[in-house]
């Protein structure tokens, strides 16, 4: 997909003029088609396919250059969230914003509603949100359908696993803080909330009978493992078409560190959804429980400091797509593939605030192995998780 005459080891700067980007130059997917802009973007095409032997087709995508405008980054939406203190976005509301005119088979609502407030649906006449853009998406789907290696590894910069939460299950003392009717989303910036285009990709995988799909990503500054599915119940049946992983950061701050500083203890009844102290007074990332098992689980841990009691309070319907979440994890991940098995290993180090002693990188917090056997078309992938060493805490 490189421009004519380009090489992978040379990136000559294109000759472009500094021209204004006019509103009339944007196409339906949000790409500005001004010639100088296109020349700049196309001078270094990131998306490409690489092959390793019989077992790995590595497909890399560019999630930045062709992305459409964030549908939630509009002043029109602000009145819905005035005074909101939870910060979650209703799952259904985001689906309406994401799909635009394509919502509900081409029948978007006239109003966007959150609790007793509503605004005009400014997305009703606009195209669905896109991460890849039309040209790259066509290339990606074609390569996915035609991939012949045992494992099709999709390498990209943004995770595909939903960051869903269940604020509708908050206890009575806190239930008034949630104005939505059902599930919410903790974040809405990556593939985890790119419902429409993600569904298009995963439906193509299913319809073509593609097996061995593995999504590997970063960006969240945390470790995640689970199943690649286009949607979660009750919006749709849970039908995973692959497995998905997010690797942690070596040094960049994650949400666990942030919450230790910003979630103050005084007059903060929802603090336990993010951070709580264990029996020894050490902070623990209960945000993992909120995402993996639900708000009741996180608040139970805050109250009792007991992991088993927290798990007993879990919401089993919240996150069928997740098997592991550690928003306090630093380290790296490895992926190994052979004729019948894919293994992803998370290697987590202690929080990197001081240099580790010795030349071996120092001690580990944990190592976790995620093993997946190759599945047949029409079957569901199955993941087996093993803690090889250390303590994964509230991550499972």
Model-derived segments and their meaning:
Residues 1-396:
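Long, structured stretches of catalytic cores involved in phosphate-ester chemistry, encompassing
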């Amino acid at each position: 997909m490189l421009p004519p005459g380009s090489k992978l080891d040379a990136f000559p700067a294109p000759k472009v003029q500094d021209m204004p980007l006019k509103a009339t130059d944007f196409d339906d997917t949000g790409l500005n088609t001004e010639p100088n802009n296109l020349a700049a973007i196309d001078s270094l095409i990131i998306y490409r396919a690489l092959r390793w032997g019989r077992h790995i087709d590595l497909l890399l995508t560019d999630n930045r250059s062709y992305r459409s405008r964030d549908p939630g980054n509009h002043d029109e939406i602000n009145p819905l969230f005035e005074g909101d203190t939870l910060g979650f976005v209703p799952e259904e509301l985001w689906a309406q914003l994401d799909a635009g005119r394509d919502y509900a088979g081409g029948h978007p609502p006239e109003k966007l509603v959150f609790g007793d407030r509503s605004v005009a649906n400014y997305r009703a006449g606009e195209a669905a949100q896109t991460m890849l853009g039309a040209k790259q998406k066509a290339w990606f789907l074609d390569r996915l359908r035609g991939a012949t290696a045992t494992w099709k590894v999709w390498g990209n910069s943004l995770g595909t696993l939903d960051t869903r939460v269940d604020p509708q299950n908050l206890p009575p003392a806190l239930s008034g803080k949630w104005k939505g009717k059902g599930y919410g989303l903790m974040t809405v910036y990556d593939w985890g909330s790119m419902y429409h285009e993600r569904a298009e990709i995963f439906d193509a995988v299913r319809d073509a009978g593609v097996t061995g799909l593995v999504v590997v990503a970063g960006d969240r500054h945390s470790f995640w493992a689970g199943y690649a599915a286009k949607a979660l119940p009750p919006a749709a049946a849970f039908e995973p078409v692959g497995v998905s992983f997010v690797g942690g950061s070596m040094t960049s701050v994650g949400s666990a560190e942030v919450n230790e500083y910003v979630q103050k203890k005084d007059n903060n009844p929802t603090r336990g959804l993010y951070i709580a102290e264990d029996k020894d007074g050490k902070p623990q990332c209960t945000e993992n429980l909120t995402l993996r098992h639900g708000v009741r689980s996180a608040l139970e841990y805050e109250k009792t400091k007991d992991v088993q009691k927290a798990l007993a309070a879990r919401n089993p319907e919240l996150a069928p797509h997740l098997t592991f979440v550690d928003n306090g994890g630093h380290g790296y991940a490895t992926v190994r593939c052979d004729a019948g098995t894919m293994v992803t290993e998370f290697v987590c180090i202690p929080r990197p605030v001081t240099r580790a002693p010795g030349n071996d990188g120092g001690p580990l917090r944990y190592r976790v192995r995620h093993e997946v056997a190759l599945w047949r078309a029409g079957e569901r992938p199955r993941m087996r998780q093993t803690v090889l060493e250390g303590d994964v805490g509230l991550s499972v």
